[in-house]
Each structure stands twice: as structure tokens, then as C-alpha cells.
């Protein structure tokens, strides 16, 4: 797939995207493929369609909170959506994203990617719970393929209960996860259909509170 085709496909997700951001994302794809030969960053079955399955899928989050400058991505793994978001924030004055990843090799990759791409990302090689009091409440918390919705609420509660909103990407079982999480939590919810996978959604969560009854 040529750079022009990638750029055009990216514009269908983020119409106002610059060529500079697209070039960063293309460079990230190349770096990801290189590192994937040495460490397991993503399922091998998805590497053939890495641009669509991971990069475009991650890119669709940014327009949902495009005015936000302070982001946090938990369980960042191979950088989806964290490094992708950082590529967009690189052109935003004062923009920054914190990436939390407990696996040392993946955290090393994230640091390399952030430096290679010159993007405003801070990488924390730590468990999410250990960062509750160390990372200032962001405007947006993201997570992709990390845990059930209820478990994500527990992991992100200190930030979400302090005014941050969440953008969590979920697959076909999302409604069951929503129903189960409402047993212990109250929250406002907006469901955004995925532009990449018709069976998936992006759950926009705000005003999270733990139920006490």
C-alpha cells in the first residue's frame, strides 16, 4: 500500500489530518513491523492488515476529543491507540499523552517509538494501579483490548471519578459488558460506531461513580 493510499484512507477517518501526521503514522507502522520480528507486539494474524486493523482503528478516537491536550492510555501494549494519538498531538501546542505499560519489552518499544517519531508521549513502565497518584488527571483516558468494561472502570476510577472522560474500544460483546458494569457503577454513556469494524464500538464514558447501595 503506497503512502498516498494510506494518506487517503486516513483522511476518511480524520478529514483534517495533515500529511506530516500521516507520515508519522506510516513511520510508526514501519517501526512496529521491524520490532514485531523480535517481540510479540500484536497478533501475527493482524500484521498483514496492520494499517487498517490497528492504525486506522486507533486514529478514529482522536476526532471524538480533538480539543483535548492531556491524554492517558492504559495498558498501552504496542502503542494502539497511545502512540497513534501521540502522532496527532505532535501538532497540538501543549499536547501530551501518558502511556502506562507494565511489560518491560513493550515499554521499551514505546519509548523508542516516541523518540523516533518526535511525539509528546511519556512512557511509564509500571502497573496502572501504581500510577494512580503519580499521573495528574487527564482530559481523556483510553484503552483498547485490555480488560472488561467493569475492570477498566476499576483501573481508571481515580481519573474518571475526578472529571476525565473515557474512550474505550469494545468488540461485539460490548452490550453485555455495559449491562454487567451497571450493577456496580453509574455513568453517562455515548456509543460511537466503529468506522473500521461494524461489530465494534467506541464507548464514551463520563461522570463515573461507584454505586454504594
UniProtKB/Swiss-Prot annotation:
Its EC number is 2.1.1.170. SUPFAM superfamilies: S-adenosyl-L-methionine-dependent methyltransferases (SSF53335). GO terms for cellular component: cytosol. Keywords: Cytoplasm, Methyltransferase, rRNA processing, S-adenosyl-L-methionine, Transferase. GO terms for molecular function: rRNA (guanine-N7-)-methyltransferase activity. S-adenosyl-L-methionine binds at residues 75, 80, 128-129, 144. It is found in: Cytoplasm. It catalyses: guanosine(527) in 16S rRNA + S-adenosyl-L-methionine = N(7)-methylguanosine(527) in 16S rRNA + S-adenosyl-L-homocysteine. Specifically methylates the N7 position of guanine in position 527 of 16S rRNA. HAMAP family: 16SrRNA_methyltr_G. Belongs to the methyltransferase superfamily. RNA methyltransferase RsmG family. This is Ribosomal RNA small subunit methyltransferase G. The gene is rsmG.
